[in-house]
A protein has these predicted regions:
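Residues located in well-ordered beta-strands
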Residues: 82, 100-102, 268
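"Short basic amphipathic alpha-helical interaction patches in structured regions
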Residues: 89, 93-98, 116-118
Length: 317
């Protein structure tokens, strides 16, 4: 109605932060563009190569000018990534030196974006959620971080002789064309990358299927199957890239929409070990030891991916 009183948001003074608020990750270039919550934080705009701010996951209609509207401020400085994260009261500061980054995972599940930085020190990873519509800006940030953590790298490893450049015929990947498309994007942006291996998604069965409990488990898995999701591995002389789903394991018949990319500097890999999966037959778990941090990749036991990981070239070998 025309005579209805204005909403609370419109009765409050407008602010530049509120005017610009939306689901997008923005680049920050001036002190005025820094969200007010973080303005006293340890971020040097002049010395940072890229600074971005990540908005809260709320609808525009639910925002007000008096709210702190940004969840994170990320600054790629000369030696470290600094992440300021909003809390109920104030914010926390996390500093991740580039030399201690073990792996970077980024990707989306529809519009649910997630960036995770794994440290080689064994501490908890740093995770930032964002709207998937801003994946391009997040990719720019990841590219800056990777350039810094590869600076001075002397890995220069010789890839396996059967590593292949260019196009690959992905058989049985009809349900995972999104991963194939992501692999194509990697090749276009990084021509030096070579294909190592891939495995398609497959339904798996429990390893121990004896007795009454085994029969019950088989019945449950028949009605509600467990699927090990597909993945593609590629590399250049300094980095391993794994293209995968956010969840390696999916139960039932639910559709899978996520696409993630994990990059690992080869220089950080101390060793790779493979062990049989505790529950599922025909699956091995490759553990990449990166300092005090371990990343696990489940792959089919007889797949090219398992073979590639068994003979992975390591700088410390």
């Amino acid at each position: 109605m025309l005579n209805d009183p204005p909403t609370a948001a419109y009765r409050q003074p407008m602010t530049a932060e509120y005017d610009a608020f939306g689901p997008w990750v923005y680049r920050v270039g001036t002190p005025e563009e820094v969200p007010r919550l973080f303005r006293d934080g340890p971020v040097d705009l002049d010395r940072s190569e890229l600074v971005v701010k990540v908005p809260r996951n709320i609808a525009r209609r639910d925002a007000t000018p008096q709210m702190d509207l940004y969840d994170h401020l990320l600054a790629a400085g000369p030696d470290a990534l600094t992440v300021l994260s909003r809390q109920q009261s104030g914010y926390t500061t996390t500093t991740v030196p580039y030399r201690s980054i073990a792996a970077i995972e980024s990707g989306t599940d529809l519009l649910d974006g997630r960036l995770t930085i794994h440290p080689s020190t064994g501490g908890a990873p740093t995770t930032v959620g964002y709207n998937g519509s801003s994946q391009e800006m997040v990719d720019r940030l990841v590219a800056v971080i990777r350039r810094h953590y590869l600076s001075g790298s002397v890995a220069g490893l010789q890839l396996p002789g059967d590593a292949r450049d260019g196009d690959v015929d992905f058989e049985n990947f009809d349900a995972d064309l999104a991963l194939v498309s992501e692999y194509g994007a990697v090749l276009r942006s990084e021509p030096a990358v070579a294909f190592l291996a891939a495995h398609e998604r497959r339904v798996v069965v429990p390893r121990d299927a004896r007795g009454v409990m085994g029969a019950l488990s088989r019945l449950v898995h028949f009605a509600w199957p467990m699927t090990l999701q597909a993945a593609i591995m590629c590399a250049d002389e300094r980095e391993l890239t794994v293209i995968h789903r956010r969840s390696w394991w999916v139960r039932g018949h639910v559709p899978v929409h996520s696409v993630c990319r994990t990059t690992i500097p080869l220089e950080r890999i101390d060793r790779v070990t493979l062990r049989p999966h505790e529950t599922y037959a025909g699956v091995v778990v490759a553990t990449l030891q990166l300092g005090r941090t371990a990343l696990e990749l489940p792959v089919p036991e007889t797949s090219d991916a398992a073979s590639a990981l068994r003979r992975a070239p390591l700088p410390h070998a």
